[in-house]
Amino acid sequence: MKKIGILFGQENTFPQAFVDRVNSKKENGISAELAHINKIIQGEPIGYDVLIDRISQDVPFYRAMLKNAAISGTAVINNPFWWSADDKFFNNALATKIGVAVPKTVILPSNQHPTDTNERSFRNLAYPLDWEGIFNYIGFPAYFKPFAGGGWKNVYRLNNMDEFFKAYNETGQLVMMLQEEIIFKEYFRCYCLDRQDVHIMQYDPRQPHEFRYVRNPKPLEKKLLDDVHNGVLALNKALGYDFNTVEFAI
């Protein structure tokens, strides 16, 4: 029997719905369940043929466990080795190389020194940074957000330099990005599976969570949808992700 497990966090709907859907298909020799993780021994399998990862971005223990599982025979979705090398700034930089339009973005050193470092650790870094050049490149309003992670945590919308430095002083050891604001007319959230199947949904991130997926969406031009579809595929093929969401503000 081939066993599929889904590893998840605080979400309550998708994991069980996924398990129920897989099991309802009654594929011979395949079953799915909510993953149960116990004793993890180096180089030893954990009892799953496939693990779908929905939480390791927030749990370092799971990241280590998934890499151990991957080298021990489990197919992990998404690739835990690639994920560990991934971050939002890299994704933006990659997008510029494959022709996908992204907002102007710069990455900044953390406001406070990382633990076990001091000013001598940063003698290669210019001080002060070229703030005028950075602000002229990005412009205001701008968004200020961590270079890794998600969930709209520690995200600021800034209108000027004074607001920037106030926010920067609140970020501690977080490595942050400053990003051009895009005033969008259309916004899409897109699922991509197996780097070939794309499901495009109209989305409004300004609404409360339960109202963000647009009900009864208006018809849109085929070219616009084709451009979004092609951008989703280009990003996921370049990133090597089997299961991912991509958002476009247009």
Predicted features by range, described:
Residues 2-8, 70-73, 81-188, 217-230:
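Active-site nucleotide/adenylate-binding loops and adjacent lid/helix of ATP-dependent enzymes
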Residues 9-121:
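Conserved N-proximal alpha/beta basic substrate-recognition cap immediately N-terminal to
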Residues 11-13, 57-58, 83, 148-150, ...:
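Short, solvent-exposed loop/turn segments at secondary-structure junctions
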Residues 51, 143, 245:
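Generic enzyme active-site microenvironment
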Residues 100, 195, 240-243:
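Coil-to-beta-strand transition motifs
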Residues 157, 192, 248-250:
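Conserved hydrophobic "DFG−1" position in protein kinase catalytic cores
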Residues 167, 177-179, 187-204, 245-246:
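Beta-strand scaffold of nucleotide-dependent catalytic cores
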Residues 209-250:
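A long amphipathic alpha-helix within ATP-dependent nucleotide-binding catalytic cores
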